[in-house]
């Protein structure tokens, strides 16, 4: 291609801005406006005549601001009209019926405020473990009865099933001995799966045999420490069985015509379902032993709904009385817990049965301290303090069920009944664990009196105080009692010798102290914790509790100047000597500071303490630290840095940033934040001085610039460095530090060749060229206003950058280099204008320095021609079939650049634009719609006074036709 000279179009930026500005249109009152709120007319209709085909109505209208979506209703909501015309009496009746139904449902359904059994299950399994050997009886499946004829009479079938049941009870089982706890759990899981498999294969009798076998296991207390966990595992199987039976009977009530509603009555169930249900209850009634008969019947208690409305209410008292036949108090209380659990699931409104269970339990409570239990404990070698903690899971659950939405009078009666019993620490603990926190808190002094009277031997008092403290963390006691409560509790807590007992109790009461008292009392508590946990390095075994103490303290002390003035707070942190734990605590502290610190601070106490905390977090970073962890630590440290401000003392602020850089050099995001902060500091200085720096402030901003220039090379991210060089150079330029700005821009230019082909973005490798293009476009926008250095040639920075772009190894089949050259052409065109588009205050750009000098313009045009030659050469290489679409796109892009920035009165440039137009359409690859819009734009521009030459150009630009 021939060489084409470049001639830039003279631009009048003010006139162009004026022509692009939207025309202001005066708006009369009441005219439509797109931002005006929509008003909808609401019609209130009153029905006058109910009979006959016509009715008269009276309406009143009012305007109101409503949701824009309501505008589609054209005034009146049809549902509102329907409601307005409804019969008031019918509406009232419907409302009353709905309210009664809702009240009934509220009583029959347990709300979300009731803690479900599933939440306690995992805790019980984790807490009650054993290393002793266990035994279990496994059902050995018999083939007897599996094959039968379909012609057997109903009585024969029943007799056969009962015989199978007898066969199981008479010894079709195998006892496995010397099982570890895990083996035992695995066997139970196998039984659960066997139950499901038998049910799925329609072997209902086998399923029942498995359940009976499992329901015998609660009677075995040979390894008593494991009993609560055994109970959980066995009741899981019972729950599965109950669910399978219920769903089976429920499915019998569903036919092709109707579906049984959730709240159905026995009348909705068909005869087949009722007969099957009775059959199950009769089978269970034939179980000879009390405990398995009780558990299996309780598991299918819900099935009574198919038989009668009063079935459940009649069965629950009977099952409650059955438990009286269980002699072992531990087995008995867990049976009551299971009955209460089933009762709450199927009939939570039947409170009388729950209460009866509780009062029956109180009558047998003395058995716990009787000779039978004591002899059993001696045989197993279990002490009473180890035996009593087996009861709370069951007792807590019974108490929770009874106290749920219970009236104050019942709770008071229960409390008084417990008070009358001797050795009632166990009961008292369950009362405090299950009753509402508000009930406990208002009677705190009464409970403290009861705790004092308890016998220490069976159940330690510190556990009772811990339970009381848990309630006081949720509800406030009377204000007049608060100090006395703390004193009474702490007298007991501080006397504890065992560090674990002490810290478990102290951790709970710290929250009460923080909530109701000042830093003085909190400091006393922290000092006492340090005193107890420091000897023999006891803190090493109690890091979770110590962490909770810190979290509770910082949750209540949002003012860090108050928090850090607590004398023992920092010594308390010194107990966290395990690095991972110490870092977690530091993260909690910094997170609280970022959330709650409202104003920037310069308090030296806060700064010194939190710098130490941040330094601890930073020093934990090593080669194995995950990126997510580094990101989190950087976020916390950056949050602290942003909240430090020394006001107008900018030098002190810079000193803080210098110190921070030395402390946090291993976290790149922190260094980036420091660079941004220092740049902002320089700009704040400029703002204070209104751009007129004194000798002192000029030296200060140069120090800020030097800080950034020194810090940026230590960063790893290539584009992070490039963007910071550019940003810092702009700040230097704004503060009239011209030589420093040149240094930043030169550093950025010298860094471009180091940009790799692929970069890691969020863990994925991506091509870097698009990011490089974006950076260079931003760079070009800055270079427009950078003045030339007097000791260097014209446009020396642009020339250096062009050389780097030329030498950079671009991807094959990539057009990014040409897009960059096109942007360079835009830059050079803007540089040739008499007055530039924008300037920096008190910085003379090249338009002022050269004043439109012909030599400068000639150099500029020569660079333009060089760039144009590169673009045209590249277009020439795209003449292959597979690259024609790229050639068309780039050709049209270059055409638009010439149209926007070139002087098309020059014949050669004009002819080049025509050639590019034809090139874009030559092979049918151009987007016709884009070409049409471009041509329309040219014709529109040609109507402007200084653009009439575009009329002739438009005539020479034909649109391609498709045949």
Curated annotation (Swiss-Prot):
Annotated membrane topology is: Single-pass membrane protein
What would be the name of the gene that encodes this protein? VPS35L
Q: Which domain of life is it from?
A: Eukaryota
Q: Which family does it belong to?
A: Belongs to the VPS35L family.
Q: Which residues carry this modification: Phosphoserine?
A: 265
Tell me the protein's name.
Answer: VPS35 endosomal protein-sorting factor-like
Functionally, this protein is described as follows:
Acts as a component of the retriever complex. The retriever complex is a heterotrimeric complex related to retromer cargo-selective complex (CSC) and essential for retromer-independent retrieval and recycling of numerous cargos such as integrin alpha-5/beta-1 (ITGA5:ITGB1). The recruitment of the retriever complex to the endosomal membrane involves CCC and WASH complexes.
- Annotated region Disordered: where? 43-69, 94-113
GO biological processes: endocytic recycling; protein transport
Q: Would the keyword Calcium turn up in this protein's UniProt record?
A: no
């Amino acid at each position: 291609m021939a060489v084409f000279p470049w001639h830039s179009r003279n631009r009048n930026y003010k006139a162009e801005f004026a022509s692009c500005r939207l025309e202001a249109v005066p708006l009369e009152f009441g005219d439509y406006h797109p931002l005006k709120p929509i008003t909808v007319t609401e019609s209130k209709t009153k029905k006058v005549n109910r009979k006959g085909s016509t009715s008269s109505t009276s309406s009143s209208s009012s305007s109101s601001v409503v949701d824009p979506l309501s505008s589609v209703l054209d005034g009146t909501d049809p549902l509102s009209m329907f409601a307005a015309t409804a019969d008031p009496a019918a509406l009232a009746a419907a409302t009353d019926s709905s309210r009664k139904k809702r009240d009934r449902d509220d009583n029959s359904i347990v709300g979300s405020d009731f803690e479900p059994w599933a939440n306690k299950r995992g805790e019980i399994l984790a807490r009650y473990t054993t290393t002793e050997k266990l035994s279990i009886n496994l059902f050995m499946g018999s083939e007897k009865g599996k094959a039968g004829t379909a012609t057997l009479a109903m009585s024969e079938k029943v007799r056969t099933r009962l015989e199978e049941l007898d066969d199981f009870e008479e010894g079709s089982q195998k006892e496995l001995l010397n099982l570890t706890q895990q083996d035992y759990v695995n066997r139970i899981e196998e039984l659960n799966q066997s139950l499901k498999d038998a049910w799925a294969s329609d072997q209902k009798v086998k399923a029942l045999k498995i359940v009976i076998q499992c329901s015998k296991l609660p009677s075995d207390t040979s390894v008593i420490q494991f009993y609560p966990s055994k109970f959980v595992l066995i009741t899981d199987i019972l729950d599965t069985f109950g669910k399978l039976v219920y769903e089976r009977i429920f499915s019998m009530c569903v036919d092709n015509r109707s579906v049984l509603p959730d709240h159905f009555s026995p009348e909705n169930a068909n005869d087949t379902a009722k007969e099957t249900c009775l059959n199950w209850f009769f089978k269970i009634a034939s179980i000879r032993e009390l405990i398995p008969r009780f558990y299996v019947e309780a598991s299918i208690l819900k099935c009574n709904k198919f038989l009668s409305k009063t079935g459940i209410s009649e069965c629950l008292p009977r099952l409650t009385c059955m438990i009286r036949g269980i002699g072992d108090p531990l087995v008995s209380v867990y049976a009551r817990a299971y009955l209460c659990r089933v009762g709450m699931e199927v009939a939570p409104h039947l409170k009388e049965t729950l209460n009866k269970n509780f009062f029956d339990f109180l009558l047998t409570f003395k058995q716990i301290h009787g000779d039978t239990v004591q002899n059993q404990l001696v045989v197993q070698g279990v002490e009473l303090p180890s035996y009593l903690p087996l009861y709370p899971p069951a007792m807590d659950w019974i108490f929770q069920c009874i106290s749920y939405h219970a009236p104050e009078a019942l709770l008071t009666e229960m409390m008084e009944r417990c008070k009358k019993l001797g050795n009632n620490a166990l009961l008292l603990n369950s009362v405090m664990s299950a009753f509402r926190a508000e009930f406990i808190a208002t009677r705190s002094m009464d409970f403290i009196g009861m705790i004092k009277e308890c016998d220490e031997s069976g159940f330690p008092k510190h556990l009772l105080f811990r339970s009381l403290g848990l309630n006081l963390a949720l509800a406030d006691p009377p204000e007049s009692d608060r100090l006395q409560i703390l004193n009474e509790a702490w007298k007991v807590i501080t006397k504890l010798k065992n560090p674990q007992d002490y810290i478990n109790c102290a951790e709970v009461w710290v929250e009460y102290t923080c909530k109701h008292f000042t830093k003085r009392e909190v400091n006393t508590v922290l000092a006492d914790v340090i005193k107890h946990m420091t000897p023999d390095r006891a803190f090493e075994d109690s890091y979770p509790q110590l962490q909770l103490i810190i979290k509770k303290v910082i949750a209540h002390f949002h003012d860090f100047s108050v928090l850090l003035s607590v004398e023992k707070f920092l010594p308390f942190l010194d107990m966290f000597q395990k690095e991972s734990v110490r870092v977690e605590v530091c993260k909690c502290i910094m997170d609280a500071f970022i959330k709650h610190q409202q104003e920037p601070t310069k308090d030296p106490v806060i700064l010194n303490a939190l710098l130490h905390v941040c330094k601890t977090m930073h020093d934990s970073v090593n080669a194995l630290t995950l990126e997510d962890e580094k990101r989190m630590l950087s976020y916390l440290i950056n949050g602290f840095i942003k909240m430090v401000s020394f006001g107008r003392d900018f030098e002190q602020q810079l000193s803080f940033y210098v110190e921070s850089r030395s402390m946090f050099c291993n976290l790149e995001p922190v260094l980036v934040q420091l660079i941004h902060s220092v740049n902002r500091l320089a700009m704040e200085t400029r703002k204070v001085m209104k751009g007129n720096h004194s000798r002192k402030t000029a030296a200060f901003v140069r120090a800020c610039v030097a800080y950034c220039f020194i810090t940026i090379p230590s960063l790893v991210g290539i584009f992070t460095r490039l963007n910071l060089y550019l940003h810092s150079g702009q700040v230097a330029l704004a503060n009239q530090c011209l030589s420093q700005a040149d240094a930043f821009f030169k550093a950025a230019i010298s860094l471009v060749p180091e940009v790799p082909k692929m970069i890691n973005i969020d863990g994925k490798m991506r091509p870097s060229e698009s990011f490089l293009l974006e950076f260079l476009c931003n760079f070009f926008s800055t270079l427009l206003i950078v003045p030339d250095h007097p000791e260097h040639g014209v446009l020396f920075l642009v020339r250096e950058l062009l050389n780097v772009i030329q030498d950079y190894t671009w991807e094959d089949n990539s057009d990014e280099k040409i897009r960059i050259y096109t942007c360079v052409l835009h830059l050079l065109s803007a540089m040739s204008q008499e007055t530039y588009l924008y300037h920096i205050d008190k910085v003379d750009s090249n338009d002022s320095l050269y004043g439109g000098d012909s030599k400068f313009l000639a150099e500029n045009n020569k660079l333009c021609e060089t760039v144009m030659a590169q673009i045209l050469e590249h277009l020439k290489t795209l003449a292959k079939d597979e690259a024609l679409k790229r050639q068309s796109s780039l050709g049209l892009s270059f055409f638009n650049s010439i149209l926007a920035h070139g002087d098309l009165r020059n014949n050669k440039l004009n002819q080049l634009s025509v050639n590019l137009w034809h090139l874009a359409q030559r092979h049918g690859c151009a987007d016709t719609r884009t070409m049409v819009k471009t041509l329309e734009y040219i014709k529109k521009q040609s109507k402007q006074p200084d653009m009439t030459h575009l009329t002739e150009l438009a005539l020479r630009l034909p649109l391609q036709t498709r045949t």
